[in-house]
Regions:
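Gly/Ser/Thr/Pro-rich low-complexity, intrinsically disordered segments
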Residues: 1-176
């Protein structure tokens, strides 16, 4: 018997019954039988482009090392954690990070898959990283400057480990 995390629809936002998640994730030798909602989540709302945010967890969410959402300065939110050694605990999850350019200059990372001005974890004047688990587009029209980047071949985007990215686009304030 083991305890595993699941994110509804395997995306940041989305509604899915616990029974649906259990059925979708079960496979021979690993049957999901019991589920509990482990976070508070948005029950309404859309992005500036009209994409639903319903189902988005308020807190930081990491499942099997995959970062769905990481909020900087969100110390008052407790997260239920299943550690890699199987131990369980509930504690605030504080995310922090920085980006170091080839020339050595640095910028603070404000979050992963969060939006600018998100209270209490504001990303103003910080770098936000969006991955393919976000709402399909950043929806941050005019909120900052965006530039597309991809992981360097062989790199993994996972918790508590550095990774390298390569810029593949020009900066833009148009969003997406």
């Amino acid at each position: 018997l083991s305890l595993r995390g699941v994110c509804a629809t395997d995306k940041l936002a989305g509604n899915e019954k616990i029974s649906g998640m259990a059925e979708r994730k079960s496979k021979p030798g690993a049957r999901y039988m019991v589920g509990v909602n482990g976070d508070f989540f948005y029950t309404r709302g859309t992005t500036s482009r009209g994409v639903s945010t319903v189902g988005t967890p308020y807190g930081s969410t990491i499942v099997d090392g995959v970062i769905y959402r990481a909020r900087n300065n969100a110390k008052e939110y407790k997260n239920f954690v299943v550690a890699t050694d199987g131990s369980l605990y509930a504690d605030p999850f504080f995310f922090s990070g920085s980006i170091v350019a080839a020339d050595g200059s640095q910028a603070t990372v404000g979050g992963i898959n969060t939006y600018s001005g998100e209270v209490p974890a504001s990303n103003v004047d910080k770098v936000t990283i969006y991955n393919d688990l976000y709402y399909g587009a950043t929806a941050e029209i005019g909120a900052g400057c965006e530039v597309a980047a991809v992981l360097v071949e062989g790199e993994k985007f996972e918790t508590a480990k550095p990774f390298k990215m390569k810029l593949v686009g020009n900066p833009s304030t148009a969003g997406d």
